[in-house]
């Protein structure tokens, strides 16, 4: 619970914002007589002098949200009470400021075990896209029938693409359905630390009690698992114990099981008993949807062209995408801007862009053409020549797309660089590949792999 001081600050800010945004008469009538009784959990309890003023206050959520973020740094909701409508219980509760005596809401059930779960990550706030569709479906299936459908579930993919998010979502869902479920989320590093501590302190029994009696083990980033013999052995035994009693195991990694050199084959082969599924980078639509959701909790206004601009800047990592949005928000706030325009966004992201441009500054059309030809095993002369079979025309379109995308070269100039083609041909190629980038995973992967070479 927040200290009184913070509550006062919060309320002062609410009234100040109100004074700035509404007329004096309305302020004196609706705002002035209101009192902040308490802030419990993330809810501000506000007492009005009359029930008829509730409707007006219901429309003032901006004041509360803004002040809440400024003072508490998080989303604050609010509950309205009116002097002329209060029951005795409510009045007592508000005056005592004691949520303990008369809890308004039933306490959330918690697992008897320290689960390590983060409630923030759930299925509802996970945006589905072509890059994560199957993995999301598998995760939902696992949460629905743990230990049944896909066991273990092995999720792999690059950094910041939602692997950890999905793990927590599975755990939270299972915990909601079954509040007594024994669940543990742990990074591989912490599993190793727990084990090392247990052996050092002679507490192996308690370690095994914890880990081998779980209903669900979520083990994150197994590529960081230590390759020490003892730990690996313990992991192997834990895995077997859990698997044998039908407990669900979910693992993540940045690579496929076969590439995990830190783990033994006998363990890696067990990973494939269940389902191995990957997450790839979000396409443009998914990035937009993620930005839309994340920007909703901001009290600034993000027009869609601004979000589109941000989505165009960061294309391979959701964590960075969130970081970019935060950065833009920060700069907008610092400049007192409430409707965030592209100009502000581009200013905020300039330093980010500089970093990527640095690595692209040596890039030339020729280099892109060479890499593409190389990637698809065709010759440079075919790539820019007149031949038109699919095996050549497709890489050519990819190369044109990349030149346009990465170098911003004009359409006619690209046409020239590709054997003197017309600019409409280039435009067509660009459109073809842009469309495919939205829903064709193979094309996304190709482009990703080629880009990584630069
Ligand atoms: P990973 O474990 O794959 O490195 P995380 O699960 O930590 O990635 O995701 C990084 C951030 O991006 C988190 O804040 C997560 O909530 C967010 N995120 C990733 N994918 C999505 C998605 N599809 N929808 C919403 N948020 C996402
Ligand atoms: Mg992670």
From Swiss-Prot:
Residues 116-332 are annotated as: Domain III, AAA+ region. GO terms for molecular function: ATP binding; ATP hydrolysis activity; DNA replication origin binding; lipid binding. Domain I is involved in oligomerization and binding regulators, domain II is flexibile and of varying length in different bacteria, domain III forms the AAA+ region, while domain IV binds dsDNA. Gene3D superfamilies: 1.10.1750.10, 1.10.8.60, 3.30.300.180, P-loop containing nucleotide triphosphate hydrolases. This is Chromosomal replication initiator protein DnaA. The gene is dnaA. Residues 1-77 are annotated as: Domain I, interacts with DnaA modulators. The lineage of its organism: Bacteria, Bacillati, Bacillota, Bacilli, Lactobacillales. GO terms for biological process: DNA replication initiation; regulation of DNA replication. Pfam families: Bac_DnaA, Bac_DnaA_C.
